[in-house]
């Protein structure tokens, strides 16, 4: 993420606790100041898995508070591990500006999440995934940031020790970024679903 950075700023601020590790590594690599510009209440759970938008928005307000002394009149690089619906990012960016930040540049330590993870817990449908429905510029405008950049797919692989992604046999289950599911999700195939189910039935008969 740091190697792909193209923004100059005063401080690096993580979204606690999800962005802590990425923000620390980012700041160390670029020799920037790492600051806790957001203070987290650890007695409030993860907001993106709450059942409704209203509750998620309230959860952000209860969970995080801006450290005005740290961020006032500063150009900030705000780092989080992911951006799903955009609820948390929008609220946090607004919170930082309300506390006096001069600029807020958002960096996400993974590629755009464009596809549901059917192997996950309470994963949103595709229509709820912000990156599946908006361009980078549109997402940036939606969350109110000065700029927005996601880690590239190859950048993700390089960050954990691979030279590049193996296009034929990916080293990771990265289907939520690429749509390249290990097993094609039948209920998402539309008109092709009946054909797929028929083939599955024939396969089972011959087992």
Residue ranges and their predicted role:
Residues 1-204:
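PRPP-associated nucleotide enzymes
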């Amino acid at each position: 993420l740091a190697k792909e950075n193209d923004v100059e700023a005063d401080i690096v601020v993580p979204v606690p606790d999800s962005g802590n590790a990425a923000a620390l590594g980012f700041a160390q690599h670029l020799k920037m100041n790492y600051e806790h510009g957001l203070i987290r209440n650890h007695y409030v759970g993860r907001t993106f898995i709450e059942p409704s938008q209203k509750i998620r928005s309230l959860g952000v307000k209860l969970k995080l508070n801006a450290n005005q002394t740290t961020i006032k009149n500063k150009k900030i690089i705000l780092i989080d591990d992911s951006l799903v619906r955009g609820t948390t990012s929008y609220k946090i960016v607004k919170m930082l500006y309300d506390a006096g930040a001069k600029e807020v540049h958002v960096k996400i330590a993974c590629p755009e999440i464009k596809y549901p993870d059917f192997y996950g817990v309470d994963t949103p449908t595709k229509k709820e995934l912000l990156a599946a429905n908006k361009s980078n510029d549109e997402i940036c405008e939606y969350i109110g940031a000065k700029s927005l950049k996601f880690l590239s797919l190859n950048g993700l692989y390089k960050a954990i020790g691979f030279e590049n992604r193996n296009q034929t046999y990916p080293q990771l289950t990265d289907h939520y970024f690429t749509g390249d599911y290990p097993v094609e999700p039948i209920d998402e195939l539309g008109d092709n679903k009946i054909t797929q189910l028929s083939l599955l039935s024939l396969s089972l008969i011959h087992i």
